[in-house]
Structure formats: C-alpha cells, structure tokens
C-alpha cells in the first residue's frame, strides 16, 4: 500500500476519478428548481415520503430552506437514521437503500459538501496534471467555507455522516434501489469523496490529535496554509489502494472503473 503526505491525500480523488472522467462528466447536483415548503411530515410514510424527499433535494429553493431551518433538517436526518437504519444497516429493503442515498444527499446539500464534490469532479475534467498541490486544494475547497471554520466544520461533519450511509449501502450486494432523479454515478462520486475525508480523519486521529473535532480543525488550518497545523508532514496510506469492499460494490454498481 502506497503512502503519502496528508496534503497530497486531500487530492487523491483526482487520481482515483481521472480514469473515469468521461463517466463522471456531469454535475451531480444540478437540477431544475421545484419550490416546496419542507416539513418533516412530508417525508414520512415510506416510499412516498422518500420520493418526495428525492424531488425536494433536486430543488435549490427547498434545499435553501432546509439550510435555513436546521431544526427541520436535523429532525429529518434523525428520522432517516431511526426509521431506515441508514448509517448502521442492514439496508435489506429497497426503501432502506434509497433512504441511505438520500441521507447522504441531505447532508451534502445542506452543507457545502455538494460543492466540494462538484469541484473535485471539475478538477478531474479540466486538469491535465496535478502540479501544485496547494493550488489544487485551494481550487476544490468551496469559497464559502475556505475561510470560515464553522462552515468548514459543518461541511466535514456532513461528509463524515454521509460516509456512514454510503458504507452501509456498499455493505449490501448490488444492484441498489436508486431514488428518482439520482444515478449510481452520482452516488459513486459522492461516496468516494466522503470516504476520502473519513480516511484523512482516521489517519490523524488519535495518532496526531485526539478527537475528530481536533482533526477537522487541523484540516482547516492545513487548507488555509496555517503553519501551526500539525498534519502537513504526516505520512498516511492511500485509502483507495486497494478500494475498500463497500466502495468497490458502489463503483461496480455504477459501472465505473476503479483500482483493483
């Protein structure tokens, strides 16, 4: 298994996804607006509620309302966790599989995790070489969180929570029940980025810093070129070589190439 500095680890998706850039040549989060007022009750009641959530997560107006209403958003996340076991599994019904994918989307779209995924995919599509890692990192971190530690922390927490759902999904045997308006290509690219962020946290916790919160703080310092960060020189294993079994299942379900 290869090893590299933590700084380089933040751009591993550029190498992982470069081989499937044509496959990922779309914006996973771009959709027409379908305004709706989000209420927890709208999303309860089994398949119908999940279909409503899938539709609403495709609406920038509804997503903006969810961002502005953390009480409803947290209640919805909790509902998906307790009703469908999206972070723990087993995801042994089509509704549970769909709910896990929607849970990941909910967390990413109500933080800046969606923009991070899109920026990484854009870098894959436009970069001809990796070159200056600091420049690459600056280009993929969303502008609204790059200098805002509260926003950066929310984005990271969202990615870590989404990773739990993607790992639970990939622990099941494909094919999967994909929500309306979503593709397994969407899921694969988001799952890869979410897993990467969990891998970075795992690599520096507790060996460098004691808690996940501390790890996120150090990552914030790193992306802002703060010389007080403790992780820029840390050597860590490439989390995508080999690809872990849940991600392998997700990539296989998407028909996406990946390291063997």
Regions found by a protein language model. Name each.
Residues 21-260:
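N-terminal alpha-helical interaction modules that lie
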Residues 16-19:
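C-terminal motif of bacterial Sec signal peptides marking the signal peptidase cleavage site
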Residues 1-8:
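Bacterial N-terminal signal peptides that target proteins for export
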